[in-house]
């Protein structure tokens, strides 16, 4: 493995807000002007490279991952050496200006490939938790931090959640979940598809569209509108929009520290097996983790996940379950290719 390379593992922050004026909920956080969003991202140390919106939310492809803005919810995930948690205070400030108050916060990440390269406050999970505790307002009084382990010391799932007594959600259905997949040791032949040809003369958008079709990413959810971007000389990001549900993929294809992530919102009634099979077939990872966050623990859904990927050569090596405030359950599963040891 390289001494140091690009950190693919993302940091992910999800903030929920509420307000007393029902008119605010029509656009809410989407009313924050683009210049203000740029200032938030400047604090994080990333920029917008592509953007799209529909009647439900706005999606931004960033120089380091993605940002999703709903009327009362913001999801921002960034990779590399970005300082994601420094977005919290400015986001709270801009939300307050339009009459919205923070009511929940969730921060998640995997284990960094290059932890010693991370800037403060991402130097350790303890530092991140201390920063979060000091930054979020006191009304978010129901708090919990947890490191969910696996059988491999290099793979764990870090979770911090904080909620006020008043928590509002767009989907109250217990069958709605968020799935975060992290993959390393990508098949080198498949990873080459995320390298651009030198001097191809294409824009990042057109090269991204080509990668989306070449790799079959457009077949994961054929109903989704995809906003994609290819970086030079390599790397890829995409945001998918399917009504009010998002999906996103980020790829760092370099050999030695290759990484890809897939995230989506879904329902236990969806064909989750199809989604997982397509994702695994596109990247053929040597190691993969799946984290699901939902209001209800579904053993049936977890079995579907295992049954979907085992025929493709991935064996479930560990599973951890933890409960968090506001009745959230997080399940963290790890898989490795059968040809590899844990």
How would you describe each model-predicted region?
Residues 1-342:
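Polybasic/polar functional segments that serve as interface/processing modules
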């Amino acid at each position: 493995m390289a001494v140091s390379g690009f950190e693919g593992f993302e940091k992910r922050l999800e903030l929920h807000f509420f307000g007393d004026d029902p008119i605010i909920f029509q656009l809410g956080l989407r009313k924050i002007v683009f210049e203000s969003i740029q200032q938030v991202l400047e604090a994080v140390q990333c920029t917008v490279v592509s953007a799209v919106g529909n009647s439900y939310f706005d999606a931004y492809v960033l120089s380091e991952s993605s940002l999703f803005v709903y009327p009362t919810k913001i999801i921002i995930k960034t990779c590399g050496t970005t300082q994601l948690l420094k977005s919290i205070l400015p986001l709270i400030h801009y939300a307050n200006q339009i009459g919205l108050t923070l009511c929940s916060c969730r921060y998640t990440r995997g284990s960094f490939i290059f932890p010693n390269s991370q800037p403060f406050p991402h130097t350790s999970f303890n530092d991140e938790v201390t920063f979060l505790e000091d930054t979020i307002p006191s009304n978010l009084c129901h708090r919990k931090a947890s490191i969910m382990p696996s059988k491999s010391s290099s793979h764990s799932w870090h979770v911090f959640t904080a909620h006020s007594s008043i928590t509002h959600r767009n989907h109250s259905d217990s069958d709605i979940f968020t799935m975060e997949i992290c993959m390393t040791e990508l098949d080198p032949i498949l990873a080459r598809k995320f390298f651009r040809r030198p001097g191809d003369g294409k824009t990042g958008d057109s090269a991204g569209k080509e990668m989306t079709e070449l790799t079959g990413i457009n077949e994961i959810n054929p109903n989704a509108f995809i906003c994609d971007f290819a970086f030079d000389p390599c790397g890829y990001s995409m945001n998918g929009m399917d009504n009010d549900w998002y999906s996103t993929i980020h790829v760092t294809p370099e050999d030695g520290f290759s990484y890809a992530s897939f995230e989506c919102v879904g329902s236990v009634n969806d064909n989750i097996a199809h989604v997982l099979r397509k994702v695994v077939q596109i990247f053929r990872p040597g190691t993969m983790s799946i984290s699901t966050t939902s209001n209800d623990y579904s053993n049936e859904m977890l079995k579907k996940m295992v049954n979907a990927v085992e025929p493709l050569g991935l064996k479930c090596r560990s599973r951890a379950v933890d409960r968090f405030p506001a009745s959230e359950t997080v399940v963290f599963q790890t898989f490795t290719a059968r040809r590899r040891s844990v």
